[in-house]
Amino acid sequence: IGFEYFEISHFFTQWGALHAPKVIASVNGRKKKIFGWDTDASSEEYIKFLRDFISCLLTHLKNLGIEKKCFFHISDEPNEKNLEGYNKAKKSISDLFDGYLVTDALSSIEFYKKGIVNFPIPSTDKVEDFINYGVKDLWTYYCCGQYLEVSNRYIAMPSYRNRIIGTHLYKYNIKGFLHWGYNFYYNQYSRKLINPFLITDGDFFAPSGDAYSVYPGDKGLPVKSLRLVIFNEALQDIRAFKKLESLTSYDYVMNIIENHGEITFKKYPRKTDYIIELRKIVNNEISKFSV
């Protein structure tokens, strides 16, 4: 298919690593839930299982030759109230991941300052705190909470607000971008399936369009949303910026991007033609310097 990198599911529950995720095993030939949200994260039984599971998983990934191309997670979106619990959960398995990339989406810089997380992925409305602190090789993400000022790709948002993310990622040399909602066709907590053609907000739990970027098509093939097409244009903008940079310099490209004012994750031209005209200029500059 062409997949090069692989993301492994979180080993503890979202928002603080308080519990075990749902784990189903074959017991005497029958499927049975052996751990779940009723299991404490520090449970000796769960930690023993988890350590055995991780050891086997890493062996399997090594046999496949992809162990260094995997991203591992502890818990999704912990906050400062979860520092102690998250740290305890991570320490229970961290020795198994020496030399591997362990990262989590989180927006409190205290996790980084205290050395609890070495590779944070902050949200776009908080990432500048990490940039200003000097964190290197940053990734960033957005989801249902990033609805003020910053770029996002909700159905209700104009396309320029979607596409502008390319200039943000380029300016701050962001190494990766994370987004959860590719094809989540369920309501909150996955209690029932929804029809994304008719119900665009996950049955009232997320802004319309947040939970998916493609629609289900014939024979299981995805149908691209306009939002995904525009987001792809943002990625192509980055490629164009990088190409011009290779012919000139980073500062040269940024002078063009910020010709009408400074660009930040929260500050950018709120008009349709800005990014289109910018791309025309960049394309012309590439042609000029490629002669």
Locations of regions flagged by a protein language model:
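Pol beta-like nucleotidyltransferase catalytic core
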Residues: 189-291
